[in-house]
Amino acid sequence: MMQESATETISNSSMNQNGMSTLSSQLDAGSRDGRSSGDTSSEVSTVELLHLQQQQALQAARQLLLQQQTSGLKSPKSSDKQRPLQVPVSVAMMTPQVITPQQMQQILQQQVLSPQQLQALLQQQQAVMLQQQQLQEFYKKQQEQLHLQLLQQQQQQQQQQQQQQQQQQQQQQQQQQQQQQQQQQQQQQQQQHPGKQAKEQQQQQQQQQQLAAQQLVFQQQLLQMQQLQQQQHLLSLQRQGLISIPPGQAALPVQSLPQAGLSPAEIQQLWKEVTGVHSMEDNGIKHGGLDLTTNNSSSTTSSTTSKASPPITHHSIVNGQSSVLNARRDSSSHEETGASHTLYGHGVCKWPGCESICEDFGQFLKHLNNEHALDDRSTAQCRVQMQVVQQLEIQLSKERERLQAMMTHLHMRPSEPKPSPKPLNLVSSVTMSKNMLETSPQSLPQTPTTPTAPVTPITQGPSVITPASVPNVGAIRRRHSDKYNIPMSSEIAPNYEFYKNADVRPPFTYATLIRQAIMESSDRQLTLNEIYSWFTRTFAYFRRNAATWKNAVRHNLSLHKCFVRVENVKGAVWTVDEVEYQKRRSQKITGSPTLVKNIPTSLGYGAALNASLQAALAESSLPLLSNPGLINNASSGLLQAVHEDLNGSLDHIDSNGNSSPGCSPQPHIHSIHVKEEPVIAEDEDCPMSLVTTANHSPELEDDREIEEEPLSEDLE
């Protein structure tokens, strides 16, 4: 069937290629023969057609064979990668039609062809068969050659891959050998030079010692200047008559440098050797105009330790300036020993207008000594910072007075006096004990979030103020109905933005905050996790130490009866019983012992303090004024002005706080410098601050949120 279809396609194509001219001519000849013999016209025409078709098929086959022979001779040279599957297709296309014996008999019977023509056809067929055999043999040879070439190429590729792998292995081995040799060399060097590391460590230690010596000299010079300025201030106050010195004491001698094994000449020589360029003379310091006060903490790049810093014994200074100075020195030395600095934080220099990035503390010290040395630019920056501090302290004193007036208005009612309790004296005239002068007072450390207002000392002996000298003003507790309708958010809401961004502990108890969280919700009920999320969302302080304050929240929820646990679809939720909450607040004031209630006039304020406050007061004792009858109504205003000039924090002095002339103080009276406590009381019985205690009756009001449970992390 394949051969027949091939012959048909070849005949059709040859007829289309050669045209219809030959066919038409033979048809014309057949028609002429048919005219002569009409009986055999149809037979002749069919025989001629068959004969023509066979001839055309043979011619087409010969042409194809010739073309393929020429292309076959060129193909092995041009395209060696020819596929062997193309060979049988071309052979099948070239196979001509073979005449079967049956077809021969039919042709003889019909007498279409003569015997000569048949012989010619047979010869042609034999020639075609020979050509086909030759072509098949040729194509077989080509296929074998292609297979051989492919095999050779594959072998070459495998050999190349093996060679590459061998080269890579050799390179890896060489690298390993080099690394081993380097390690051996390093080990040999370490064995040969064991003292190199020790030398490097010694060099680092020497550099650190040089930096420490440089900072020590600078600190000592600053201390000298501060002492001189303090002496000038005290002399000016003495001339004005505000401070009097007992006759047994000298007139404020100038403190010399500490005896740390170095004389002033040696210290000056050491300073010149360390700095090299910036040689500092005493005259240069005086004419340089460097004005440093005790409150300028930014210019004090101190690195003194407890061994190097001298125990300075200051004399009577207005309202606790000496203790503040000592506290700052102690805190600065503590920060230096802990590899920290006031001017260094989060890898950035905090010098005003600098903000240079320092990777470690050593690099910061180099930057500080190089860029911020004692020159005109640093001196000018220091003066600007002093002015900033002065303005802020003036603003702070004004705000404190405003707060005091607000608290006086809110918590005291002069129209309804209560004669039994006596308010605390604001200013008392005391004499300084010699034993107190020998030991330098230690002040409590200050924090930025707890503003300290040193309050004038309170005697432990008989009260200096008589009932006639002070108006009998008591605090009348307001009823709950006065403030029952005012929402709690009116006290917390104004400070939301501050507490949301600043890491400051809010001045409210856990109970108050939990109640506020529940009251702010839409359905007045919250789950425990929702309360936690309200705390962290509202206050930046609660975004750390989660475990501690969460325990305190759970403790408050289970402790107080005003918080009710309700089971619903969401689970366990907490609600607030407002009546129980208000009842609890009233019981808290009436049931707890007051601080100064029913104290006889023969007892001092120290006898009524609780244990925790007494311990705090014992640590922060400071002598103040030294003569009775010194402060009067006229001098209170002068003290206020002096307090602003000294950058201090003198509290507002009541004009009625003059001492009674009839009472004389005892010879040995311990004056107490009280650090103003943070807004949150450390104990329920403790007052929220000494300002409120001094301005109010001991019966503290019940509607102050801080009087409730302390907001401390100790509740677990």
UniProtKB/Swiss-Prot annotation:
One of its GO terms (cellular component) is nucleus. One of its GO terms (molecular function) is RNA polymerase II cis-regulatory region sequence-specific DNA binding. It is found in: Nucleus. Residues 1-45, 286-340, 439-466, 650-669, 679-716 are annotated as: Disordered. Its main location: nucleus. InterPro entries: FH_FOXP1_P2, Fork_head_dom, FOXP, FOXP-CC, TF_fork_head_CS_2, WH-like_DNA-bd_sf, WH_DNA-bd_sf. GO terms for biological process: caudate nucleus development; putamen development; regulation of transcription by RNA polymerase II. Keywords: DNA-binding, Metal-binding, Nucleus, Repressor, Transcription, Transcription regulation, Zinc, Zinc-finger. A zinc finger (C2H2-type) spans 347-372. Residues 505-595 bind DNA. Forms homodimers and heterodimers with FOXP1 and FOXP4. Dimerization is required for DNA-binding. Interacts with CTBP1. Interacts with FOXP1. Interacts with TBR1. Interacts with ZMYM2. Transcriptional repressor that may play a role in the specification and differentiation of lung epithelium. May also play a role in developing neural, gastrointestinal and cardiovascular tissues. Can act with CTBP1 to synergistically repress transcription but CTPBP1 is not essential. Plays a role in synapse formation by regulating SRPX2 levels. The leucine-zipper is required for dimerization and transcriptional repression. This is Forkhead box protein P2. It comes from Pan troglodytes (Chimpanzee). The gene is FOXP2.
